[in-house]
Amino acid sequence: FKIQREKERFSNFTTMNFDIIKSEDKAFRNRAEFRIWWENDENGNHTISYAMNDFNKNILEIDSCQIVSPHIQEVMPKLLELISKEKELEDKLFAVEFLGSTTNDLLVTLIYHRKLGEAWNILAKELESKVNIKIIGRSRKQKQIISEDLISEKLNINNKDYNFEYQEGGFTQPNTNVNIQMIEWVLNN
């Protein structure tokens, strides 16, 4: 469907054939962001979970996400469980962003609706160590980098390894396989 739609959109400009770059169906995204959803039971106890908006802008709670990389899939539940055990890490947590790589380097940005202090820094450092990730805390006009705000990536392009550094907040192609194919297409054409 998409291929035919795009051919029609470009039909006034070209009749050339399109080279199609295909993606995997699952476990292909190395970048993802999720809202945090707070749920209270009848006794006032709360739980937190990851959430997204569906097509109608309704909240969709999720406990897993099959399109993210296996490493992100593995870290998601562990991270949420550990955060939920520490009030300082959990308090007013609004969203979580993941930026991963093929080297299993993973940067997690925790976004809050409150100012982050020294107590948060100490617990975030412990969380980094327990989960083996890099953490950044963000809130309005604040960015707390616990160890560093970048990750290492290694891509094999035309049978040669290239090393990259991806920085938090910068653009990265979230689909590593598509990224490699796009770069190879440019180099080969």
Language model features: what each stretch is:
Residues 1-189:
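Accessory RNA-recognition modules of RNA-modification enzymes
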